[in-house]
Structure formats: structure tokens, C-alpha cells
């Protein structure tokens, strides 16, 4: 059952789903992302990761409009340490290669500096394959 987060206009900006078959959480970010929305969404994602004792996150930014640089510092300094402490080990981030969101994702990856296994993908199937390979190696 997905969790939908909506903005002040009633539009869904994030759909979070736990995928029990693959044992990962899937975040589908949609549209322009505000700082408050990113913080709320990232925290909601942490809850689902914790509830399912999940170490794998598939984060999809292909439908994001514009950059989200305004939240990168918070993600690196606040969210990531809590996610790692909660057991998150692998973060697959799917972006449209030429988008401003891709630039923000690269900034996030640099900020994390190896604290978390994070890779950027332009193809969601490649991201899923990477997470599945990580799961096989972990068992």
C-alpha cells in the first residue's frame, strides 16, 4: 500500500512504497521539490525503511522538475546518518541524466563520500539489478 505525500495544492509530490518481493523501499518523487517537502518525504521514507527492516532504497527522481540543491546539505548531515543508523546500506538513485535533479543527486553522492553505497542510474531496471546483486552478495 503506497504512502502518498501531497503539497499545499493537493498534488502528490512523493509516493513511497515497500516492495516485499524485492525487500526495498521505492520512492517516486514527482514535480518541483521544496525543502519542507523533501524533509517530510525523506523522514516518511525512514519510517517505512525501519518498519520493514529494509537496507535497500530505490529512489526515483525521473519525474522531478528542477534542482533540489536546497536540501542536499540536510540530507547529507541529518537524514543520511539516521538512515545508516537504521540499517540502510544501499541507495540506488534514478535520474534523468541531463536534468537539474541529476546535478543535485551528484552533489548528494559527493557529500556522502562513501558513508553509504550510493549509485546514480539513468535506467530504473539497471538500478533494480544493482540492488538485487547487492542483496545476493549480502546473503
State each model region's role.
Residues 1-139:
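Amphipathic, Lys/Arg-enriched alpha-helical "gate/interface" segment within cytosolic domains
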Amino acid at each position: 500500500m503506497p504512502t502518498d505525500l501531497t503539497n499545499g495544492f493537493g498534488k502528490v509530490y512523493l509516493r513511497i512504497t515497500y516492495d516485499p518481493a524485492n525487500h526495498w523501499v521505492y520512492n517516486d518523487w514527482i514535480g518541483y521539490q521544496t525543502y519542507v517537502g523533501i524533509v517530510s518525504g525523506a523522514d516518511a521514507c525512514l519510517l517505512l525503511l525501519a518498519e520493514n527492516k529494509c537496507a535497500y532504497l530505490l529512489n526515483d527522481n525521473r519525474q522531478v522538475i528542477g534542482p533540489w540543491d536546497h536540501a542536499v546539505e540536510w540530507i547529507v548531515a541529518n537524514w543520511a546518518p539516521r538512515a545508516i543508523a537504521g540499517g540502510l546500506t544501499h541507495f540506488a538513485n534514478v535520474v534523468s541524466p541531463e536534468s537539474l535533479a541529476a546535478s543535485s543527486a551528484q552533489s548528494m553522492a559527493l557529500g556522502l563520500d562513501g558513508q553509504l553505497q550510493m549509485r546514480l542510474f539513468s535506467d530504473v531496471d539497471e538500478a533494480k539489478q544493482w540492488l538485487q546483486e547487492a542483496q545476493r552478495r549480502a546473503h
